[in-house]
Amino acid sequence: MTAQLNPFRNAFRLPTKQRINWFPGHMNKGMRQIQQKLRNVDCIVEIHDSRIPLAGRNSQFFDTITGSGVKPHILVLNKVDLLGPKQQRSVLQQLRRQQPELKNILFTNCKDQRNHGVLDILPLATQLVGDSSRYNRAQSAEHNIMIIGVPNVGKSSIINVLRNVHLKKRSAARVGAEAGVTRAVGERIKIQEKPAVYMIDTPGILQPSVTDDEMGMKLALVGCLPDHIVGEDLIADYLLYWLNKHRRYEYVEKLSLSSGPSDNISAVLAEYAQTHGMFHRVKQYDGQVEVMTNLLAAARKFIQFFRTGQLGSINLDEHA
């Protein structure tokens, strides 16, 4: 009996040998500024995207910032509204199994000011600071909390939510839909009066080189890298690969694919574009204008479906 061939790829490879690399000048500057301010920091709050609990979290960077565990540390997994309760439990077990040194983990949705995880950040940080040896800051009544993490995971948004909740004041940290809005380590932002708590916003820091294709594509898919750095067509192709690999075929109905699951991103995008009237006019070399399916618009829509949770709750580090 002939074994049935797997119609899908069993590995994802970039079309060129060039690795994804996004470590612009403001990140180098940010790293130096972070290290300069550490002496006056009492607690580190690391914000990360809950859909990639492992990918992009630099252990060497973590050790440098926390002093190998000397400074209190909280891992905040944000955007939990895109994960779901069942996936939360799975992620928690995964982290405790692979990184047992992580003691303080919170799941948050920074879009909801009543979210329990968001409301727990400040009390937990205050408790950890109170229980820690503050050394040169032992006489200070103020608490300084530094917010760190990769780009576009909601660091500035969480600062603004906490400021609004505890001080009833408007936003103080810049936010944006794309990675890289915060480009320098900010000044202290007051979050609470008694005790006086200040937060320090920082630019998103990635490893100087993303040496693993899968890690780079996961970061790109959740928006930690600007889409144009990687290319929407490549991001959409990785999304298709991941969904097929994990037998998550919800995309077939969402994209109105009459032929069922496919491993051909060009065919998938072309069918979706045709079905939904996505066309654009392209001028040919001979000057003639041809109406063609807009594959880029279709790729952006496919990515948007994932980022807004319309393809279901997904942990991209599942089985990692």
From Swiss-Prot:
Keywords: GTP-binding, Membrane, Mitochondrion, Mitochondrion inner membrane, Nucleotide-binding, Transit peptide. It is found in: Mitochondrion inner membrane. Residues 31-208 form the CP-type G domain. Gene3D superfamilies: 1.10.1580.10, P-loop containing nucleotide triphosphate hydrolases (3.40.50.300). PROSITE patterns: G_CP. One of its GO terms (cellular component) is mitochondrial inner membrane. It comes from the Eukaryota. GO terms for biological process: mitochondrial translation. GO terms for molecular function: GTP binding; GTPase activity. CDD domains: YlqF. GTP binds at N78, K79, V80, D81, N152, V153, G154, K155, S156, S157, G204. It is a peripheral membrane protein. The keyword Iron-sulfur does not apply. PANTHER family: MITOCHONDRIAL RIBOSOME-ASSOCIATED GTPASE 1. Plays a role in the regulation of the mitochondrial ribosome assembly and of translational activity. Displays mitochondrial GTPase activity. Belongs to the TRAFAC class YlqF/YawG GTPase family. MTG1 subfamily. This is Mitochondrial GTPase 1. It comes from Drosophila pseudoobscura pseudoobscura. The lineage of its organism: Eukaryota, Metazoa, Ecdysozoa, Arthropoda, Hexapoda.
